[in-house]
């Protein structure tokens, strides 16, 4: 028998989250962002649930090829653009759209020979200072692209750095409006946080929104708001079972480094999940977990293959957890109880994004219970 740990992907949650995005931006087109293999969920697994989007956005040419192989004939956007000249030939062959964020990419386009002109998204560095042309250079980059026979359409985009926080988007939105004033072309500004928090403003919604983490049921502005506030459903459940129970006395310690000391008689459960499965090492005592649908906590240090949980809340509820009891590390328990991946990530000093993407290869993944 394999270890009892398993990640389950829920197609109904993916579909519901996409509908939630459309409710926020009924007049905009939606990019379903599936970079990092759909945030660890698997592009092939999420494809049918998200094919109601208007396009897919990702980074990797191999993943783009995979989407075409699945039968997708709509738009695919390469969010970091091309990395070398030969990538443009594949863009032509597969009909890919791609971001242009630097002079080197324009140079590659200028030297490219193809019968199929390219659709590009010209990126503005509105203040995040990762990728994109500075505002004072944006219009000249647009003019260079517009003069190329290799380019048939130029869309305009930027990425907000603080759509999820109190600084907001106003300065970067203003920079985008100034840089793109009177330029033709579709606009794309909103990431997940901006889509939920700022899309009431038509200038923010623009023509395309880029829905990423929101599709997978994580709140982009946690802890300011949780997933429930936004009406999102967890698309991934990581679950395992208890493989042992220990009875402790006052003063007994748990795990490596004796990080937890029992305050009195208590029972702990040993769950088959550890940091080698992608569960964060730094999720120590107090990290929330569900056992048979009841909320409790991790105690002690997470090991490579195991972690330990406090069974006191279950016993207080009149339950007798034991070998084989269900343990929900994040997501939805069989009882329907939900533990947000964002809460677990916060306890480990990280983000839900990282936990999704860090799921270990050794963890079996099913879609709606099917391998």
Curated annotation (Swiss-Prot):
* Pathway(s) it belongs to: Amino-acid biosynthesis; D-alanine biosynthesis; D-alanine from L-alanine: step 1/1
Give me the residues that bind substrate, please. 130, 304
What is the E.C. number?
Answer: 5.1.1.1
Record key words, sorted = Isomerase, Pyridoxal phosphate
Q: Give the required cofactors.
A: pyridoxal 5'-phosphate
Catalytic activity as recorded in UniProt: L-alanine = D-alanine
Query: Which InterPro entries does the UniProt entry name for this protein?
Result: Ala_racemase (IPR000821), Ala_racemase/Decarboxylase_C (IPR009006), Ala_racemase_C (IPR011079), Ala_racemase_N (IPR001608), Ala_racemase_pyridoxalP-BS (IPR020622), PLP-binding_barrel (IPR029066)
Q: What Pfam family does this protein match (any one)?
A: Ala_racemase_C
A single Gene Ontology molecular function, please? Answer: pyridoxal phosphate binding
Instruction: Name the job this protein performs.
Output: Catalyzes the interconversion of L-alanine and D-alanine. May also act on other amino acids.
Name the family.
Answer: Belongs to the alanine racemase family.
Question: PANTHER family, per this entry?
Answer: ALANINE RACEMASE, ALANINE RACEMASE, CATABOLIC-RELATED
- Please identify the protein, giving its name as recorded: Alanine racemase
Origin organism of this chain? Verminephrobacter eiseniae (strain EF01-2)
